[in-house]
Curated annotation (Swiss-Prot):
Membrane-spanning ranges: 115-139, 153-173, 350-368, 389-409, 900-922, 930-950, 977-998, 1011-1029, 1066-1086, 1100-1120
Gene Ontology MF annotations: ATP binding; ATP hydrolysis activity; metal ion binding; P-type calcium transporter activity
Name of the molecule in the record: Calcium-transporting ATPase 2
Cytoplasmic side: 1-114, 174-349, 410-899, 951-976, 1030-1065, 1121-1173
Claim: Transmembrane helix is one of the keywords in the record: yes
Family (UniProt): Belongs to the cation transport ATPase (P-type) (TC 3.A.3) family.
Stretches of the chain found on the membrane's Vacuolar side: 140-152, 369-388, 923-929, 999-1010, 1087-1099
Class in the EC hierarchy, top level: translocase
Lineage: Eukaryota, Fungi, Dikarya, Ascomycota, Saccharomycotina
NCBIfam families registered for this protein in UniProt: ATPase-IIB_Ca, ATPase_P-type
Native source species: Saccharomyces cerevisiae (strain ATCC 204508 / S288c)
Subcellular location field: Vacuole membrane
Main location (coarse class): membrane
Positions contributing to Ca(2+) 1 binding: 398, 403, 937, 941
């Protein structure tokens, strides 16, 4: 079919076959004539051709069929009850079905599928069956004293099965908790707000509540919440995350697309096999304008409105997400510890295999020869002996495999992220929580992070007048210089009108419909400002923390907040400050803002807005071109309004307007006066804004030929418009105050004590930036005297790489910086070896946020693009939250190191003790039975992980220097403690096991009864557990004397007091109580299942006192400097030890290099300690 034939067919289809059904067929409810699939076809793929099939060449048909209005949006009687409407019943809302988590039983089954657990279960069942056979089918046996021996072997089988069940249950419970934690995190990070027009009002709603037919307002930095068709404006979108297309795509209104489609596919055009569609290129190289905004794409520049056509699972983003099965991510630390656990497991498996081979070989020698010890036993007893060997070997594997390592990091991260959320950090990427512990540099924005982001115009120079609303002046001066008084008495009505037009029309902020003015605060802009921070926090937290479908709770909370107070305007804080000034002093009435924008003719004599130029950080200004009905010569003319950074806008001004409307050409004298005013504002830490305009009286249409944009001929090129010679008139200067956040100075000083360098990166001019940096201690007296302590972004980006590296140690303030300057700063710092955290709020900050080791975006003032690019969202935009993130990052690292220290002590001791005692035993039994070992395994894996991985940050955690990138899991001081405690425990348990008969019964080993032997074995087990009990107490504090080489200097309460701040971690205290109580119960009531014989008083005292030796050993090890250990174990010895016993010879890669990324021993920061590693 030719193009004209198909074009005619499209027209015929549209005229004759438009959707006309009204019933419930195809899932369409009454009053809606389009199905979900029909609307979904518009975007998947993007097709204006499909649009024409449905709606024809008139965009108004789109609004007709979706029952919405281009300007007023959809009409809902009660916005909160949208689920009762046919619109919702027909198309749904924009929420996606939640991923169904694994049930608890599924997790139990997954935990039981562990091969070791299954082997142990099979062995337990066999042991149980053999025990029953001996009990019921074999004659009774008697000991040398003639006492009947109780047949209790079957009890051990049952006890092992119960122990396996408990281990599996605990493992499943931990996994279930982890599933819930990640589900909760995903809910928090996937929710956000969008501006929609409903009932002819702009409101903020959750993206999950967006409906088909909603008209949404999009601006730079937004992420498109659902598939929509653009109906007004112009913007650039990044669709790479959805389509993979790396180039940005310009978006135009649907009318442009329909015009191009009709033109390119007209009968007069060249023939093609099929009509051209969005993305196709005609013979002239032109494309059809793209009006289709895909859900999940990002608005990089511009602004506009779109009407929603597909939501939820019917949108492109929804279809993509439902096809994925997102599993919780593994962080680098989790992967590292999993590999470490695998390496340790190798040693356990090797030990178990050797143990089995030794015991089995001896077992064969016992049963094959006629004089062998087991030769005369019946088959069931021989089988039972073999099963004991097998169970002991399998249990060694169970104990040796440190499954608690991955669990510990999961618990530590879950605990830390939960607490960080309470402290104002929403962790989007788990690895960032770990990385913050090593941070050495923080590059922070100023606005909202170091300051409150509660902006108020406190000083200004309208024309040649001056006002001052700050409270620093005497009362009499305040009355004279009050802004309202100055505007009314000193400024002409036309100047006031032009300033009001510039502020009202040249803004994206809008009026808060829920705002209720407090009569008691009619002139209290300061009172208004005080509460902004609290409301922003409430909004931000609700935005990210809605649970399930508790919209009613959210609405109720907002209603309660509204009873107190809210800000009158929503949007950019600079723009809301200017609008507040307009309401306070320029006559803007409540509820009038949107009316003036819709009907500018009424007050301003403006026919229409012809070009909008939204603010971008790279330009530092926003602009607007309007058409006036008539000017002084009674003819229509165009006016360009501009407001932005004072020094940038004012330097392009040719004239200065006086308060009486006379113009004064700018020369060197009055230019210096203006520059001085700007400097004075900046020196007082005020943001200086210039407000200006330029008239175009000689052009009949917009834009003038000389200003026309080559790519978009219907608008003026921004560089030509702003830099056009002559004519820009400066209407006034305004100084905006943004108070420093409470406690920010202390937070910065905390970072400095912690060895973290804080740099301020801001778009403000250098004088303002330096003033604020001094106030918050970033720029101290010592640093400010140094060269290059503060510089502007334009100067910084001109430097060579080597010059940047040379000045960065002194640089603390980067002013008038662009997002590219911030990215360059981060790149240079990382190249110098720093671990860099950076904050960002704008769309253009995304590259820097991605490049940084940890990117912080603003939860209140940040764009959606910035949030998507970040690792952590600062829900309150507060710098103190970054300090908390550093604390918790360090706490995670410390908690993991504590657990590794404890785990390896128990691991080494338990495996060696079991191995040696089994081999040395004449009847091939270990001093620790399988059930006892499973109890020990429960202590060292699950309970210890809960106790040690859930600790809060130490009070002095910010007094230590950061480790940087080369932080190792196991330091010299940790290895000292591991080897010393393991040696102590082995000596104590070996003495009790091998010399117990002589110590307690004054008899040789061969002379004691089986009951006495069982008592000694039980005492060894009891001692072993109490050793771990007190070792856990030692492990809760890492070596605080690290780095102190003086023996006397290491004797301090901070280093040696293991009970310091013990009460702050209730988890630890509870678990210690559980371990101690359970051990006492086992020793009194464990009986046959735990192979326990009643202990004497002396045995109890011995066990507990021997356990306390761990505390004494801990003190001695802490006093010993690390340098002593390094000298004992030289580097060459350690490298050979790692190569052989670390199994590095098995892990060589093909190039011959060692793949030691996950090796147990890592290279340390200090040259002295490398020998020990």
């Amino acid at each position: 079919m030719s193009r004209q034939d198909e074009n005619s067919a499209l027209l015929a289809n549209n005229e004759n076959n438009k959707p006309s059904y009204t019933g419930n067929e195809n899932g369409v409810y009454d009053n809606f004539k389009l199905s979900k699939s029909q609307l979904s076809d518009l975007h998947n793929p993007k097709s204006i051709r499909s649009f024409v099939r449905l709606f024809g060449y008139e965009s108004n048909s789109l609004f007709k069929y979706l029952k919405t209005d281009k300007n007023a949006g959809i009409s809902l009687p009660e916005i909160s009850n949208y689920r009762k409407t046919n619109r919702y019943k027909n198309y749904g809302d924009n929420s996606l079905p939640e991923r169904i988590p694994k049930s608890f039983l599924q997790l139990v089954w997954a935990a039981f599928n562990d091969k070791t657990m299954q082997l142990l279960t099979v062995a337990a069942v066999v042991s149980f069956v053999l025990g029953l056979y001996e009990l019921w089918m074999q004659p009774p046996q008697y000991d040398p004293e003639g006492n009947k021996i109780k047949q209790v072997d079957w009890i051990e089988g049952v006890a092992i099965m119960i122990a396996v069940f408990v281990v599996v249950l605990v493992s499943a419970a931990n996994d279930y908790q982890k599933e819930l934690q990640f589900a909760k995190l995903n809910k928090k990070k996937e929710n956000r707000k969008i501006i929609v027009i409903r009932n002819d009002q702009e409101i903020l709603i959750s993206i999950h509540h967006v409906l088909v037919g909603d008209v949404i307002s999009l601006q730079t930095g937004d992420v498109v919440p659902a598939d929509c068709v653009m109906i007004s404006g112009k913007c650039e979108a990044d669709e790479s995350s959805i389509t993979g297309e790396s180039n940005t795509i310009q978006k135009f209104p649907v009318d442009n697309s329909l015009r191009d489609f009709k033109k390119f596919n007209s009968i007069d055009s060249h023939n093609h096999s099929k009509p051209l569609d969005i993305g196709d290129v005609n013979e002239d190289g032109n494309k059809i304008a793209d009006c289709m905004l895909i859900s999940g794409s990002r608005i990089l520049s511009g602004l506009g409105r779109g009407v929603i056509t597909s939501v939820g699972i019917n949108s492109v983003y929804g279809q993509t997400m439902t096809s994925l099965n997102a599993e919780p991510e593994s962080t680098p630390l989790q992967l590292h510890l999993s590999q470490l656990a695998d390496n340790i497991s190798v040693y356990g498996c090797v030990s178990a295999i050797i143990l089995f081979l030794v015991l089995f070989t001896r077992y064969l020698f016992y049963i094959i020869p006629e004089d062998g010890r087991f030769h005369d036993l019946d088959p069931a007893q021989k089988g039972s002996k073999f099963m004991n060997i097998f169970i002991t070997s399998i249990t060694v594997i169970v104990v040796a495999v440190p499954e608690g390592l991955p669990l510990a990091v999961t618990l530590a991260l879950a605990f830390a992220t939960t607490r960080m959320t309470k402290d104002g950090n929403l962790v989007r990427v788990l690895r960032s929580c770990e990385t913050m512990g090593s941070a050495t540099a923080v590059c922070s924005d100023k606005t909202g992070t170091l300051t409150e982001n509660v902006m108020t115009v406190v000083r200004g120079f309208p024309g040649n007048s001056k006002f001052d609303d700050s409270k620093s002046l005497p009362v009499s001066e305040q009355r004279k210089l009050n802004s309202k008084k100055v505007f009314e008495e000193n400024c002409s009505s036309s100047l006031r009108n032009d300033l009001l037009a510039n502020i009202v029309l040249n803004s994206t902020a809008f009026e808060n419909r829920d705002y209720k003015k407090n009569d008691k605060n009619t002139n209290g802009s300061k009172n208004m400002s005080k509460n902004l921070s609290f409301l922003d926090k409430c909004k931000s937290r609700l935005s990210f923390f809605k649970k399930g479908n508790r919209e009613d709770d959210e609405d109720q909370l907002f209603k309660n907040v509204n009873k107190g107070r809210q800000e009158p305007f929503i949007g950019s804080k600079t723009e809301t400050a200017l609008l507040s000034l307009a309401r306070l002093s320029l006559g803007l009435q409540p509820g009038e803002l949107q009316y003036l924008r819709d009907q500018p003719m009424e007050k301003f004599n403006i026919e229409k807005v012809v070009q909008t130029i939204p603010f971008e950080s790279s330009r530092k200004w926003a602009g607007l071109v309007v058409k006036y009905k008539e000017g002084k010569n009674k003819k229509p003319f165009y006016r360009f309004f501009i407001k932005g950074a004072a020094e940038i806008v004012s330097k392009n001004c040719s004239y200065k307007r006086n308060s009486d409307d006379t113009l004064e050409e700018i020369n060197e004298d009055n230019k210096k006066e203006t520059d001085d005013e700007i400097k004075n504002l900046a020196s007082d830490a005020l943001r200086a804004i210039s407000v200006a305009h330029k008239d175009f009286c000689e052009c009949d249409s917009w834009p003038p030929e000389q200003l026309r944009d080559k790519d978009s001929p219907n608008i003026a090129a921004l560089d030509l418009l702003f830099n056009s010679q002559k004519g820009l008139i400066l209407d006034g200067l305004l100084g905006i105050q943004d108070p420093l956040r409470a406690g920010v100075r202390e937070s910065v000083q905390q970072c400095q004590r912690a060895g973290v360098t804080v740099r301020m990166v801001t778009g403000d001019n250098i004088l303002t930036a330096k003033a604020i940096a001094r106030n918050c201690a970033i720029l101290s007296t010592d640093i400010s005297s140094e060269a290059y302590s503060a510089m502007e972004g334009t100067e910084f980006r001109k430097l060579t790489k080597n010059e940047r590296i040379r000045i960065l140690p002194n640089l603390r303030v980067l002013a008038r910086s662009s997002p590219e300057d911030k990215r360059l700063l981060v790149e240079t710092l990382k190249g110098m070896g720093d671990v860099v955290a950076v904050t960002g709020d704008g769309t253009n900050d995304a590259p820097a946020l991605k490049l940084a080791d940890v990117g912080f975006s603003m939860g209140i003032s940040g764009t959606e693009v910035a949030r998507e690019a970040s690792d952590i969202i600062l829900m309150t935009d507060d710098f103190s939250a970054i300090v908390n993130a550093i604390k918790w990052g360090r706490c995670v690292s410390v908690s993991i190191k504590k657990f590794i220290q404890f785990q390896l002590i128990v691991n080494i001791t338990a495996v060696i003790l079991t191995f040696v005692s089994s081999v040395a035993s004449s009847d091939e039994t270990s001093v620790l039975t399988a059930v006892q070992l499973l109890w020990i395994n429960l202590i060292m894996d699950t309970l210890a992980a809960l106790a040690l991985a859930t600790d809060k940050p130490d009070p002095n955690i910010m007094d230590r220097k950061p480790r940087g990138r080369s932080t190792s899991l196991i330091s010299v001081s940790t290895w000292k403690m591991i080897l010393s405690q393991a040696t102590l425990q082995l000596i104590v348990t070996f003495i009790l096991h091998f010399y117990g008969p002589e110590l307690f019964f004054k008899k040789h080993e061969d002379e004691i009864t089986s009951h006495q032997q069982q008592q000694l074995n039980a005492m060894t087990f009891n001692t072993f557990v109490w050793l771990q009990f007190f070792t856990m107490l030692v492990s809760r504090k890492l070596d605080e004397g690290d780095g102190i080489s003086n023996w006397r200097g290491r004797i301090s309460a901070a280093n040696l007091n293991f009970f310091q701040d013990l009460g702050r971690n209730y988890y630890f205290l509870t678990i210690m109580a559980i371990i101690g109580s359970c051990q006492v119960l086992i020793m009194f009531f464990g009986g046959a299942p735990f192979s326990i014989a009643r202990q004497t008083k002396s045995m109890w005292i011995t066990a507990v006192l021997c356990g306390m030796l761990s505390l004494i050993m801990g003190v001695l090890v802490r006093i010993c400097p690390d340098e002593v250990a390094v000298k004992v174990f030289p580097a060459a010895f350690v490298q050979r030890f790692k190569y052989v016993f670390g199994l590095e010879f098995l892990r060589k890669n093909h190039t011959g290099k060692h793949d030691d990324e996950e090796a147990l021993l890592e290279e340390s920061d200090s040259p002295e300690s490398t020998a020990f590693y």
